[in-house]
């Protein structure tokens, strides 16, 4: 397969992974809690946990939605 074909396939797989399931069911949240609210201007960095890389969560702090490393409480 040519490198152009591989890039196209990778792009399509990436888009497919970001699409919400057609059934309308939300994916489960990732484990852990969001750390305390950061002191910074409003920013919308993510829509849900799955729009964040790795184990990061999409944390909502009022007008701020950003990807953050989770904290775990025993």
From Swiss-Prot:
Signal peptide positions (record): 1-24
Record localization: Secreted
Domain WAP: 27-71
UniProt superkingdom: Eukaryota
Keyword Disulfide bond: yes
GO terms, molecular function: serine-type endopeptidase inhibitor activity
Single biological process term from Gene Ontology: innate immune response
GO CC aspect terms: extracellular region; extracellular space
Tissue/organ expression: Expressed by the venom gland.
Disulfide bonds: 34-59, 42-63, 46-58, 52-67
This protein's UniProt keywords: Antibiotic, Antimicrobial, Disulfide bond, Secreted, Signal
Family named by the database record: Belongs to the venom waprin family.
Function: Damages membranes of susceptible bacteria. Has antibacterial activity against the Gram-positive bacteria B.megaterium and S.warneri. After 45 minutes of treatment with this protein, B.megaterium have no visible pili and are smooth. Has no antibacterial activity against the Gram-positive bacteria B.thuringiensis, S.aureus, S.clavuligerus and B. anthracis, or the Gram-negative bacteria E.coli and A.tumefaciens. Has no hemolytic activity. Does not inhibit the proteinases elastase and cathepsin G. Is not toxic to mice.
Protein name: Omwaprin-c
């Amino acid at each position: 397969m040519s490198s152009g074909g591989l890039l196209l396939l990778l792009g399509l797989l990436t888009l497919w992974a970001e699409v919400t399931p057609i059934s309308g069911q939300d994916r489960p949240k990732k484990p852990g809690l969001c750390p305390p609210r950061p002191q910074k201007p409003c920013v919308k960095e993510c829509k849900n946990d799955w729009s964040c890389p790795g184990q990061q969560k999409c944390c909502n702090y009022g007008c701020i939605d950003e990807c953050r490393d989770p904290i775990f409480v025993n």
